[in-house]
Design a protein with these regions (language model features):
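Ligand-binding loop in jelly-roll beta-barrel domains
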Residues: 38, 96-123
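Active-site donor-binding loop signature of nucleotide-sugar glycosyltransferases
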Residues: 51, 88, 119, 130
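Conserved short histidine dyad/triad with adjacent acidic residue
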Residues: 27-30, 45-61, 99
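Short acidic-glycine-tyrosine-enriched beta hairpin
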Residues: 80-96
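A short, N-terminal "cap"/entry segment at the start of jelly-roll beta-barrel domains
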Residues: 1-41, 125-148
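Short, charged/polar surface micro-motifs in flexible loops or helix N-caps
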Residues: 50-54, 74, 83, 98-100, ...
Length: 148
């Protein structure tokens, strides 16, 4: 297995949410580092958040666990339990099927970098309670209203 070269010019910029839910994420850049190797059991993303940007809309996963490790800068974790500031070396994990939705905001004036590590269950459904929609399984990537 050869090493993959990190190419700063090949970032995925922003989020694919329907407007206006994509707006807070415009300053997000993501590099799916494990995709180049064809890994199917877990994924690792390098994420850069510009000042004022969100990582995602607040969400939780039905069948995927998730871990975030902060490399540089400062991000604010926002959950149903409140807010917590995270900095370099801090780590937080989210269990699958726990409806305590989460996301990160960069409220500082500096770039923040973190790694997002999680499962890759193709049938996972992500629920976005604040935005009022859920994302179908990864292979379909469509958004639909949350069922009552």
């Amino acid at each position: 297995m050869k090493k993959a070269q990190f190419d700063p010019d090949k970032a995925i910029v922003g989020a694919s949410y329907p407007p206006p839910h994509n707006e807070p994420c415009r300053g997000r850049k993501t590099w799916p580092l494990t995709t180049v190797y064809g890994l199917t059991q877990f994924g690792v993303n390098r994420v850069e958040l510009a000042p004022g940007s969100w990582s995602t809309q607040r969400h939780w996963h039905k069948t995927n666990d998730e871990v975030v490790v902060v490399v540089s800068g400062e991000i604010v974790l926002v959950t149903d339990d409140g807010e917590e500031v995270l900095g370099p070396g801090d780590c937080v994990a989210f269990r699958m099927n726990d409806p305590n939705a989460h996301h990160f905001q960069n409220r500082s004036d500096q770039l923040a970098v973190f790694y997002d590590i999680g499962g890759r269950d193709p049938y996972d459904v992500s629920t976005f309670p604040d935005a009022g929609f859920e994302a179908k399984p990864r292979f379909e990537i469509k958004f639909r209203p949350i069922k009552p």
